[in-house]
Amino acid sequence: MAKWSYSSLSLFKQCPRKYHRLRVVKDIRQEDNTALIYGKEAHKAAEDYVRQDTVIPEKFRYLEPYLNILKKLEGEKLCEHEMGLTKDLEPCGFKDKNYWWRGIADLIVHHNDTAYVIDYKTGKSSRYADVKQLQILSVATFKHFPKVNYIKAGLLFVVSKDLIKTNYVRNQVDSLADNFRFDVERLDKAYETDVWNPVPNFTCRKYCPVTDCEHNGGYV
């Protein structure tokens, strides 16, 4: 049984060989680029501000208006909230040995039967926004918070000032989880057969750390 997260499954879908080298063999590392470092710092600034009113660093001050709106929502606010699910979609700890999926919600605000699930994005455009990340986070939220029956989820693009919204109800849990079954089964099969074929993609030429792959721009 392959364990997965939204990011690891996305990596596998992009290129099984890249996934294998980074997540299985672990003989190479993906160095953090400027955009990734910036995103991590922005997430930390948002977490500290919502959790404990820590002053936001000047370069992230543009986040404050959006975070103030979120802070005014009624309910308990959980920042960088870790959740896990077993293969039977039962809630478990993020670090439990029997976890099947795990993920971190940037912000969950829950009150009575309703929860907000927010993921911050620091990319310059929301053009290719993928709400599937919200789908699996919402499944986990329903499972970890049994009193929640309604979820208002959103990808908050703080740079482009866009909010990609979607709503879910509890009886959608199974159908939302099914959206990932095909790709997870492919991942299981790759582990079973130890076959990790490369898939040429936009990262090959300049951004892939698997430099000994024939599709890599630095391959000799």
Describe the residue ranges of each PLM region.
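Short amphipathic alpha-helical face segments that pack within enzyme cores
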Residues: 41, 132-140
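Residues immediately flanking
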Residues: 16, 105, 111, 120, ...
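Active-site metal-coordination segments of metallo-dependent hydrolases
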Residues: 32-38, 124-131
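Catalytic cores of nuclease domains that cleave nucleic-acid phosphodiester backbones
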Residues: 45-117, 125-127, 132, 143-154, ...
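Short amphipathic alpha-helical segments and their helix-coil junctions
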Residues: 1, 16-29, 114-118, 183-194
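Metal-dependent nuclease catalytic regions and adjoining charged, substrate-binding loops involved
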Residues: 3-4, 86-91, 97, 129, ...
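A short beta-strand motif that forms part of the nucleic acid-binding face
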Residues: 121-124, 170
